[in-house]
Amino acid sequence: MSVIDASALIEILLKDETAAKSRRLLSHDLFAPAILIPETVNALKKSARLKLVTKAIARDKVAFLSLLPIDLVPMQRLSLEIWQLSDSLSAYDACYVSLAMQLEHTLITNDRRLAKEARRFVDVTILD
């Protein structure tokens, strides 16, 4: 079981969705703070705006989000931990780290800066 962040999910959705590693990740129990959805939608919108993908592909990926086997956790239960972690992390990144801490799960990310900071608190897997 793992906590997945938006950078890892975007990597899977846009660049690597057919790879064996991604299929393996998506077949495991995954958790994320509810902020995963707006962060992922924002990244997909930006990718379309920058013409990295077409609007149709980005829209299809957004629709696919609701089908993913990811348990979303409301963020209000993470508020205090987010506050405490936000000295060294953005509040957004702290959402993922605090959830991984609470659940005692590995954090999956594609953000090397986040991974470096998060390793002080949880195990981290970086997508390559």
Language-model region placement:
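Helix-loop-beta junctions that constitute the ligand-sensing/allosteric loops
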Residues: S90-Y92
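Acidic catalytic patch
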Residues: I57-D87
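Short, well-structured N-terminal submotif of metal-dependent ribonuclease cores
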Residues: M1-I35, L50-R59, R112
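Phosphate- and divalent-cation-binding pockets in alpha/beta enzyme and binding domains
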Residues: K21, E39, E81, K116-E117
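A general alpha-helix detector
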Residues: E39-A43, K61-F64, E81, L99
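Acidic, PIN/NYN-like endoribonuclease modules and their adjacent C-terminal/linker elements
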Residues: M1, V97-D128
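Short active-site oxyanion
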Residues: H28-L30, I70, M101-T106
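Short glycine/serine- and small hydrophobic-enriched flexible loop segments
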Residues: N42-R49, Q102
